[in-house]
Structure formats: C-alpha cells, structure tokens
From Swiss-Prot:
GO terms for biological process: glycolytic process. The active site is at E188, K230. It catalyses: beta-D-fructose 1,6-bisphosphate = D-glyceraldehyde 3-phosphate + dihydroxyacetone phosphate. GO terms for molecular function: fructose-bisphosphate aldolase activity. The record marks Y363 as: Necessary for preference for fructose 1,6-bisphosphate over fructose 1-phosphate. This is Fructose-bisphosphate aldolase. Keywords: Glycolysis, Lyase, Schiff base. Its EC number is 4.1.2.13. Belongs to the class I fructose-bisphosphate aldolase family. It comes from Schistosoma mansoni. Pathway: Carbohydrate degradation; glycolysis; D-glyceraldehyde 3-phosphate and glycerone phosphate from D-glucose: step 4/4. It holds the Pfam family Glycolytic.
Length: 363
C-alpha cells in the first residue's frame, strides 16, 4: 500500500489546473458579485432602491448582460447562491449570460463568520457541514470555482495563534472538498484594514497568516496548481496617521507573498478591501511593476472597487442601465491594464477616488 493516497485523479487535476489558469489569464481578473442579501441591501439603500429580489435580479442582470467586451478583462464572476437561480428578462439564467460571454461562473460557498470561543472577538467561518453536496450541485449548475472567506483582525494581541490555526484549517478543509467536486477553490484569508497599525505590522501579520494557510493546505493534500489565493493587499490600517505611497504598499505586498506563497499557485487575485476604485487599481498596477521574482499571476477579485460607480450611475432606473454598464467596462479595462502593470492613472469613473471602507466588513 502506498504511503500517499491520491484523492484526485490525473484528469481531475488537469481540469482544476486548466480552470485556475484561465481565471488568471494575462490582463483578466474576477468580478466579485457575491454580496449576501443583507449586504446588497446596504448597497441598494445608498442609492435609494428597495432591497427586494426583483431589484437584486435587475442589478445583477445589468452586470452580466454588459457588452461582450467585458470578457476581455473579466474571466470569472463570483455569484451568491440566489443569483444561480435568477433569470434575465428573456428567460435565461443569469449564469447563462456569463457563459455566453465566455466568463466562468463561480460561487460563494461559506455561510459567514461566527465567534471563535476563547478569543477576543475573533471569528471562524461556518459552512463545512454540507459543503460536499452543495459543491456537487453548484458544479451541475455550471459553476467551476468557489470562494470561502475567513477574516482576521490586527490589534496589539490579534490575530491570535488559535484564530490563525483554526481559520487556516477551515480554508484547507474547504479547498479539499471543492477540489474533490470539480471546483477550483479560491482561498481568502482576509486581514482586515481596520485599526491604526503601520505598513510593516500589516506586512508581518499577512506573512504570518499566509504561512499558517499554506501549512494547512499542505497538511490536507490540497492540489496547489488547482487553487487561487485571494489575499488583502498589504496596506496600513485605516486609522494609521502615516500615509504610504502605492509603491510602498506594493513592495510590502510582494515581499509578504514572496516569503509565503509557493510558486505552484497559479494566481493571486487580490481583494480590494474598501479601497477607492482608483487606489485599488493603482496599488495593483504598482504590485505588477515591482521587479524581482513573481511566479504567480497578480490580478484582481474586486467587489466594491468594480461596482461602486456602477451602482451610483444606475440608481435603480432602467434608463441608466447602459451608462452603468459603461462604468463597469471602464473599471474592468482599467484593472485589466493594472494586472499587467500598464494602468495609466485615470479611469474617469463616477466614484473613482471615493473611499469604500466599511468597518469590520462582513459579506
């Protein structure tokens, strides 16, 4: 009997690797449209639109029915479960709109954060119990990748050893289950930007968290070539009194990744973490311009930083749909350029430099 029992066939590994590589193709990234019903409610409230299923459907239809040019810079979209079953005005399922544009549908599979007992307001993420059966069903409905978010906070005594260990193991269990069911797992250990910590502290904590994550992924025999990482960019805390340049943020980010992320991982798809549309894009651009070894694609998996101007333009009005879609195309093109280090510094969107920070952000 072999000491190591493979849990994936060669064909399964090939499929996972192919999907992961397609998602992080040069100049392409992910639109994170997986906001929960409650979070969508907050976004719709900001533009004076009622949070009901029809308005959520109309908004997501707006996103997914944009011009086919969207696929030049968006390779995948993360969906919320409700969206899987919603249909466009002409009767097509919303994931079908994506497939018609050669955009890969993905799905958020975690069930939110819950308190981690024995810690100071730290959390773990729930949703493992029925994950295998849900993943099998999501694959049947056309999804080819998944996302699971864990959250860690920086303070004088957090993240704790327990929180880092627990969240890393949860992410590894999730990743293993996804792969067994044909879904590429996006591993998201978000270190929140809340706090007054400086850039070096953010870098060191990010390194610590990622080290825990990749140890757990190895322990659980996760096939790294069939995964993607969705980390925070390394930035100082929102309340830090010192301002750092995009170049300083980029250098700290790349150093943290070089020290912790194996080269077998095909791509790193950064979250925007409440940065303004312009700041997130500038930071991504500078990350790609940093010299030195970067063996992974460095691209985006943005939610707010790809949608804020879209929502502000739409305002829930049918006559604004085309203009809102044009905002989405501008944002996608700008971030596609940033993903190869060629963003020119201006995207011309409605809310380009407006901060999108939400304290203690929950999806």
């Amino acid at each position: 009997m072999s000491r190591f029992q493979p849990y994936l066939t060669e064909a399964q590994e090939n499929d996972l690797r192919r999907i992961a590589q397609a998602i992080c193709a040069p100049g392409k990234g992910i639109l994170a449209a997986d906001e929960s019903t409650a979070t969508m409610g907050k976004r719709l409230q900001q533009i004076g639109v009622e949070n009901n299923e029809e308005n959520r459907r109309l908004y997501r239809q707006l996103l997914f029915s944009a011009d086919h040019k969207l696929a030049e810079n968006i390779s995948g979209v993360i969906l919320f479960e409700e969206t899987l079953h919603q249909k466009s005005d002409d009767g097509k399922t919303l994931p079908t709109l994506l497939a018609e544009r050669n955009i890969i549908p993905g799905i958020k599979v975690d069930k939110g954060v819950v308190p981690l007992a024995g810690t100071d307001n730290e959390t773990t993420t729930q949703g493992l119990d029925d994950l295998a059966s849900r993943c099998a069903e999501y694959w049947r409905l056309g999804c080819r990748f998944a996302k699971w978010r864990c959250v860690l906070k920086i303070s004088s005594h957090t993240p704790s050893y327990l929180a880092m260990l627990e969240n890393a193991n949860v992410l590894a269990r999730y990743a293993s289950i996804c792969q067994q069911n044909g879904l590429v797992p996006i591993v998201e250990p978000e270190v929140l930007p809340d706090g007054d910590h400086d850039l070096l502290t953010a870098q060191r904590v990010t390194e610590q968290v990622l080290a825990f994550v990749y140890k757990a992924l190895a322990d659980h025999h996760v096939y790294l070539e069939g995964t993607l990482l969705k980390p925070n960019m390394v930035t100082a805390g929102q309340a830090c009194k010192k301002a750092y340049t995009p170049q300083e943020n980029a250098l700290a980010t790349v150093r943290a990744l070089q020290r912790t992320v194996p080269p077998a991982v095909p791509g790193i798809t950064f979250l925007s973490g409440g940065q303004s549309e312009l700041d997130a894009t500038k930071n991504l651009n500078e990350i790609n311009k940093i010299p030195g070894p970067k063996p992974w694609a460095l691209t985006f998996s943005f939610g707010r930083a790809l949608q804020a101007s879209v929502l502000a333009t739409w305002k829930g009005k049918k006559e604004n749909v085309h203009a809102a879609q044009e905002e989405l195309l501008k944002l996608a093109k700008a971030n596609g350029a940033a993903a190869v280090g060629k963003f020119e510094g201006n995207m011309g969107t409605t809310l380009g430099d407006k901060s999108l920070f939400v304290a203690n952000h929950a999806y």
